[in-house]
């Protein structure tokens, strides 16, 4: 690990949060430097993602759990920059999930797939301005969206109109059925 990365990693491990508090307690009880403990945990998780049962679930929990928590905090904060950062992550996560749905049957057979997927998701949620989600959104998703926006808007409008027509027709039929049922009930009494 380069000196700059090691220093940044150590700074990250000394920030105040529940995980670093737990690391501090472990460090105090064992006498082992918290960076070694963290690297050990990372190594165990990586091994589990390669060989463990339920690696898919663990990977999805990592890709969903922390971002969901931070997204809720971002919604509750007055700052809107963090909202944009996490909305970008969720757009990329959604696109990735759809692509993965069609390719997962093949990819899940590769031994390092879930470890690589987890690394990809961690890269997408990295706390830096040029993280994976930002990069993929700006270079791939946004240009594609802008190119096809009017067509997608048209399809969405058509679907919305058809859904409204269907809901109105079902409501109308339900009202008729209710009136008929009540009318038959009055006749029988």
Curated annotation (Swiss-Prot):
InterPro entries recorded: TB2_DP1_HVA22
Region (Required for dimerization and maintaining endoplasmic reticulum morphology), start-end ranges: 114-185
Localization (cell): Endoplasmic reticulum membrane; Sarcoplasmic reticulum membrane
Cytoplasmic face residues: 1-34, 75-84, 124-189
One Gene Ontology term, aspect cellular component: sarcoplasmic reticulum membrane
Keyword annotations from UniProtKB, A to Z: Endoplasmic reticulum, Membrane, Sarcoplasmic reticulum, Transmembrane, Transmembrane helix
Main location: endoplasmic reticulum
Family: Belongs to the DP1 family.
Function recorded in the entry: Plays an essential role in heart function and development by regulating the organization and function of the sarcoplasmic reticulum in cardiomyocytes.
Subunit structure: Monomer (heart, ventricle). Homodimer (atria, kidney, intestine); maybe disulfide-linked. Homotrimer (heart, ventricle, skeletal muscle, liver). Interacts with ATL1. Interacts with ATL2. Interacts with ATL3. Interacts with CKAP4. Interacts with RTN4. Interacts with ZFYVE27.
Recorded domain comment: The short lumenal loops between transmembrane domains 1 and 2 and between transmembrane domains 3 and 4 may impart a wedge-like configuration, thus deforming membranes.
Protein name per UniProt: Receptor expression-enhancing protein 5
Organism from which the protein derives: Pongo abelii (Sumatran orangutan)
Lineage, opening ranks: Eukaryota, Metazoa, Chordata, Craniata, Vertebrata
Gene for this chain: REEP5
